[in-house]
């Protein structure tokens, strides 16, 4: 099997009431951990590359790592996606370089400017057999080079989605319903605290999601900033020398609810970073004399695999859907 687009993935997900996980990749261990979990659980998967990851690891290295994962896991569909492309030139480079899906994120621009840039990318992508994700509404938070300060985010306006999709021809739409990028998704002022002192985030705006679904029947919706920031990993990071106070994410039960609706793609990045970093910190604390990268990257890779398997089974619902 070769790399696929997300077209068939999303159709099956929409009809089946589940979502496909889109996991950000930066190196070999992350690619292996994600695809080993997806392969064993017979789940479709999207491997996505940000502008920052591309600068860090090099376009060619990342593409070849993903192609190797396809060879090693021929029984599952794998798509290679550009996350948060911010220019036509970046999207074009990825389209020309083997990606099967790209996102053009012009959500910070005016409505008309967003339409114009998205349409330009769509026309080029479709001519080359590549699908396009666009975005309406703006998420707060920090992830790679995507930075939006709290208070500057904006929910998607459902009354705009039909016109936007019709005029751009995009294949899926990322909307803003209260998710946020990074491990610090919400300020303390936005949350309450539970009995253990852990921040409890405000609920997602399912009313916005449901209105978008009503206006775009059968159309794939995407959620960005959907890491749950598992507290066991936050605790591990802090226990072994880290400092991540009040890191909090999106409750998994809310993501599971979204996946049963029209949300066909759920983006997860920070949870991978936390799983790896927590386990690497723990390893060095327990083995201060070790220096072989294979020694500490092996448990980090396993942590990624276990975390992705959990997401596939209990959040996305995509196990057995390859």
Regions found by a protein language model. Name each.
Residues 4-12, 27-53, 60-75, 85-220, ...:
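Alpha/beta enzyme core
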Residues 5-21, 290-291:
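Generic N-terminal amphipathic, Lys/Arg-enriched alpha-helix
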Residues 20-24, 80-81, 103, 221-223, ...:
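Short catalytic-loop micro-motif centered on adjacent basic/acidic residues
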Residues 137, 226, 271:
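An acidic- and aromatic-residue-enriched active-site/binding cleft used to recognize and process polar
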């Amino acid at each position: 099997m070769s790399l696929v687009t997300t077209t068939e993935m999303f159709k099956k997900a929409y009809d089946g009431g589940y979502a496909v996980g889109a996991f950000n990749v930066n190196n070999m261990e992350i690619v292996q951990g994600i695809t080993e979990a997806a392969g064993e659980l017979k789940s479709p998967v999207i491997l996505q590359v940000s502008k920052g990851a591309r600068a860090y690891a090099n376009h060619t290295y990342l593409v070849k790592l993903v192609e190797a994962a396809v060879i090693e896991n021929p029984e599952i569909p794998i798509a290679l996606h550009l996350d948060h492309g911010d220019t036509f030139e970046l999207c074009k480079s990825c389209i020309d370089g083997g990606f099967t899906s790209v996102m053009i994120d012009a959500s910070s621009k005016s409505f008309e400017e967003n339409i114009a840039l998205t349409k330009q990318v769509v026309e080029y992508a479709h001519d080359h057999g590549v699908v396009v994700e666009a975005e309406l509404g703006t998420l707060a938070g920090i992830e790679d080079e995507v930075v939006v300060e709290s208070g500057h985010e904006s929910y998607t306006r459902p009354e705009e989605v039909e016109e936007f999709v019709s005029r751009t021809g995009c294949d899926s739409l990322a909307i803003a319903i209260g998710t946020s990028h990074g491990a610090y998704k919400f300020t303390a002022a936005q949350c309450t605290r539970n009995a253990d002192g852990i921040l409890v985030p405000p609920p997602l705006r399912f009313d916005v999601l449901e209105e978008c679904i009503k206006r775009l029947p059968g159309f794939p919706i995407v959620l960005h900033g959907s890491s749950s920031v598992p507290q066991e990993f936050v605790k591990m990071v802090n226990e072994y020398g880290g400092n991540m106070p009040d890191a909090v994410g999106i409750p998994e039960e809310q993501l599971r609810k979204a996946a049963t609706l029209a949300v066909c793609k759920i983006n997860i990045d920070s949870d991978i970073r936390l799983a790896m970093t927590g386990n690497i910190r723990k390893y060095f604390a327990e083995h201060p004399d070790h220096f072989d990268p294979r020694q500490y990257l092996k448990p980090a890779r396993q942590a990624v695999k276990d975390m992705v398997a959990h997401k596939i089974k209990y959040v996305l619902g995509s196990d057995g859907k390859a």
